Amino acid sequence: SALFLAMHYTPDTLTAFSSVAHICRDVNYGWLIRYMHANGSSLFFICLYLHIGRGIYYGSYSYTETWNIGIILLFLTMA
């Protein structure tokens, strides 16, 4: 969904809002793609945080190399 949104989005500060309005109004099912992207990314990050919480609960932080690689992957995901 991000690829379809990126084809119509303009990151310029003057035209960003109008490009989002263009996606919602003029692109076929653009509103659906936008909402599916927002909900899908929210679900992805909820699952990511649950996975981290599971690792904390089961004491996986004692494996420092594995834990540090996971933290690096978390930061790369958010970047």
Curated annotation (Swiss-Prot):
Positions annotated to bind heme b b562: 37
One GO term describing the cellular component: mitochondrial inner membrane
Residues annotated to bind heme b b566: 51
InterPro entries: Cyt_b/b6_N (IPR005797), Cytb/b6-like_sf (IPR027387), Di-haem_cyt_TM (IPR016174)
GO MF term list: metal ion binding; ubiquinol-cytochrome-c reductase activity
Keywords, in A-Z order: Electron transport, Heme, Iron, Membrane, Metal-binding, Mitochondrion, Mitochondrion inner membrane, Respiratory chain, Transmembrane, Transmembrane helix, Transport, Ubiquinone
Membrane topology recorded in Swiss-Prot or TrEMBL: Multi-pass membrane protein
Described purpose of this protein according to its UniProt entry: Component of the ubiquinol-cytochrome c reductase complex (complex III or cytochrome b-c1 complex) that is part of the mitochondrial respiratory chain. The b-c1 complex mediates electron transfer from ubiquinol to cytochrome c. Contributes to the generation of a proton gradient across the mitochondrial membrane that is then used for ATP synthesis.
Subunit structure: The cytochrome bc1 complex contains 11 subunits: 3 respiratory subunits (MT-CYB, CYC1 and UQCRFS1), 2 core proteins (UQCRC1 and UQCRC2) and 6 low-molecular weight proteins (UQCRH/QCR6, UQCRB/QCR7, UQCRQ/QCR8, UQCR10/QCR9, UQCR11/QCR10 and a cleavage product of UQCRFS1). This cytochrome bc1 complex then forms a dimer.
Family of this protein: Belongs to the cytochrome b family.
Protein's name according to its UniProt entry: Cytochrome b
Source species of the chain: Dipodomys californicus (California kangaroo rat)
